[in-house]
């Protein structure tokens, strides 16, 4: 018993002498927990404030806020077409730009008949480079361009290793993804500055968050658009221009054609129409957003996860999408 009592007394003495260290470790643990938890709580609040609260109120008057006409590039498919329809539902006149005249005319007629707004179509193949911009500049001259949506984009046929990407596709990514957005902004921006109002929305991609294997050139071009938009916002916010970098993840579009798994999860990959309804509600509120609540959750995971985990997940998903695309071609 004496040995037991001696051990118990020794334990109490050690515990008493270490109590200050235990308290210090508890404080460090509390500080670390708060440091990790507070940003997550703030991000969750921002998600609710951005994606849900604005949709509870009345629709904003986009014509009064920005101007009467909206220009949308890449307007015959996917997000571009849906965004054009959503802006038309707010009463804006729509200028549609794409390379497929027949589809342009069909979309323009549908928008004009459905929403009773004016429409104008401009046929332009952005992959042809510099020569196409003079006619666009002339067509937009003296118009009250309130909103520009840069959605035109070139995409891989399916995820591929860079050495397997056709050279024409690489040039398309440079001319369509990078040059088109830059020059369209250069065309409409002077008029917006003169009127002291306007909005520029440039559609980037969730693949710009971190290096994305098997979409190397595409994700790099979208990273350019993200940085370009954010820099423009700093340059022109004081002049009344709102610039938004829109960073969607997958939508169920014929342009991106996600695999069957994503098509079975509409909350992960919404339809272009649902996506556009949510994205337009963030206009004037967030300078950099995914545009859709579940995409914002995916973006938060991407921001907080280590790069090696992102690369592993991207490789896993893109291998699956490539395998599915190749098997459908066989």
Curated annotation (Swiss-Prot):
Matches recorded under SUPFAM superfamilies: NAD(P)-binding Rossmann-fold domains (SSF51735)
Keyword flag Acetylation: yes
Region (Required for mitochondria translocation) residue spans: 2-82
Gene3D superfamilies: NAD(P)-binding Rossmann-like Domain
Keyword Manganese: no
GO cellular component annotations of the record: intermediate filament cytoskeleton; mitochondrion
Residues that coordinate or bind NADP(+): 74-80, 125, 222
Modified residues (N-acetylalanine): 2
Main location: mitochondrion
Record family assignment: Belongs to the short-chain dehydrogenases/reductases (SDR) family. 17-beta-HSD 3 subfamily.
Protein name: Inactive hydroxysteroid dehydrogenase-like protein 1
Subcellular location: Mitochondrion
Keywords linked to the UniProt accession: Acetylation, Mitochondrion, NADP
């Amino acid at each position: 018993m004496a040995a037991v009592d001696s051990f118990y007394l020794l334990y109490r003495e050690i515990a008493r002498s270490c109590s200050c260290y235990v308290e210090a470790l508890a404080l460090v643990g509390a500080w670390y927990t708060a440091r990790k938890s507070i940003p997550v709580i703030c991000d969750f609040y921002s998600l609710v404030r951005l994606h849900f609260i604005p949709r509870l109120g009345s629709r904003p008057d986009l014509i009064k806020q920005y101007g009467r006409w909206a220009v949308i590039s890449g307007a015959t498919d996917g997000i571009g077409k849906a965004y054009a329809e959503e802006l038309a539902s707010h009463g804006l006149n729509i200028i549609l730009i794409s390379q497929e005249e027949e589809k342009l005319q069909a979309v323009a007629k549908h928008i004009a008949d459905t929403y009773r707004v004016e429409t104008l179509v401009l046929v332009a193949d952005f992959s042809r480079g510099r020569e196409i911009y003079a006619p666009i500049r002339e067509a937009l001259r003296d118009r009250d361009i309130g909103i520009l949506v840069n959605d035109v984009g070139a995409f891989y046929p399916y995820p591929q290793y860079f050495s397997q990407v056709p050279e024409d596709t690489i040039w398309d990514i440079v001319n369509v993804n990078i040059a088109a957005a830059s020059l369209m902004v250069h065309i409409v921006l002077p008029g917006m500055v003169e009127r002291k109002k306007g909005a520029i929305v440039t559609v980037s991609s969730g693949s710009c968050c971190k290096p994305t294997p098997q979409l190397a050139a595409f994700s790099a071009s979208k990273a350019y658009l993200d940085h370009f938009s954010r820099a423009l916002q700093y340059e022109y916010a004081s002049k009344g221009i709102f610039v938004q970098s829109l960073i969607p993840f997958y939508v169920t579009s014929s342009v991106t054609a996600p695999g069957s798994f994503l098509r079975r999860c509409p909350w992960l990959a919404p339809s272009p129409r649902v996506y556009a309804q949510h994205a337009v509600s963030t206009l004037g509120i967030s300078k950099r957003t995914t545009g859709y609540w579940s995409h914002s959750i995916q973006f938060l995971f991407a921001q907080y996860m280590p790069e090696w985990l992102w690369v592993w997940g991207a490789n896993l998903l893109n291998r699956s999408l490539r395998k599915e695309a190749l098997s459908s071609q066989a």
